[in-house]
Amino acid sequence: MEKNPDIQFRSPEEIKLYQEARLTETLAYLQAHSRFYQQMFKEHSIDITRIKKIEDLQQIPVTTKTDLQLHNSEFICVDPDDIIDYVTTSGTLGDPVTFVLTSKDLDRLAYNEYLSFNTAGCSRHDILQLMTTIDRRFMAGLAYYLGARELGMGVARVGNGIPELQWDTIHRIHPTCGMVVPSFLIKLIEFAEKNQIDHNTCSMKKCVCIGEALRNPDFTLNTLGQRISEKWPSLQLYSTYASTEMQSSFTECSEFHGGHLQPELIIVEFLDDKNLPVKVGEPGEVTITTLGVEGMPLLRFKTGDICYQYTEPCACGRNTIRLSSVLGRKGQMIKYKGTTLYPPALFDILDDIPRVKNYVCLLYTSPSPRDA
């Protein structure tokens, strides 16, 4: 993996040329080491030397979650002795998939989060309170710790849950930044209010949020984001988008206008149901090609997540592609009386009802031919 943190500030044309050079290296690596992609290239008569531009990726079939589940071990590109870490996906849309990482992959993971924290305006002068698990085969928790260490931040590894312990840590260590699932911030606020803690004057000034959307496609705060911001206006909220499969993340800058691509680490496409690129302004399925991964690199992997892309330059100075919060997962699309919607739209409504603390959404298919 090549570290080039300045590439995100280059022109879109320079970024594209840089990524195409890394793509050539990735294809050669897959041809040499991946049993799954060796078979794919053979079956589809793909000459990787002819794949020179990002647009040429359309000549290659996509990789799906089903491929990963059915052929998990065939994606591994390294000897077992070179594997340092084992993790699994969340299994949101099916059986969890095992991913393996080498020592260099862990370095890449650390660099990813270094870039992510940097994008969110963190520095070595910050102290991070890690409010996510670092165990249970969860890649991200370890990534956050490694990235904070690379940036030079101090870290308090509190883990998830236990509001009392979280507030005790805030009072003892005075962290300036939190890494957290945003809905847990509601629980921290409720605990503070019940225990006469003035959360608006505490040391915590920003949170990098994972796992749940905070914004609408127009960049305004959604219901969850509004609830947090109204109760804790002094806290800045930064959204991220990531997955185990991509081993990297998209993170908002201080403009809060979408998560920035990290060009050294992945190539992203936005595809329709026919695996063709959608136009800017149309929602598409996030499809990624990893760059610089040794253990289990992926080529044109369809994440199942539907997002918008933004290509205009950002006021922060970065010229990378940005993406919106997740509109929904392709496998969870609902058609109701001719209208298409995704579960997050329901979540946003339920999050706006104060008396609703927890909920489960159940979907049933009507026995009649029409949807209901």
Name each region found by the language model.
Residues 364-372:
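Single conserved hydrophobic/aromatic residue that forms the stacking wall/gate
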Residues 127-129, 195-218:
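Conserved helix-loop-beta element of the AMP-binding
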Residues 216-313:
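Conserved AMP-binding/adenylate-forming
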Residues 103-118, 127-187:
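AMP-binding/adenylate-forming
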Residues 236, 357-363:
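A short linear hydrophobic-aromatic micro-motif
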Residues 301, 320-350:
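Adenylate-forming
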Residues 1-88, 94-111, 115-119, 230, ...:
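Nucleotide 5′-phosphate-binding alpha/beta core
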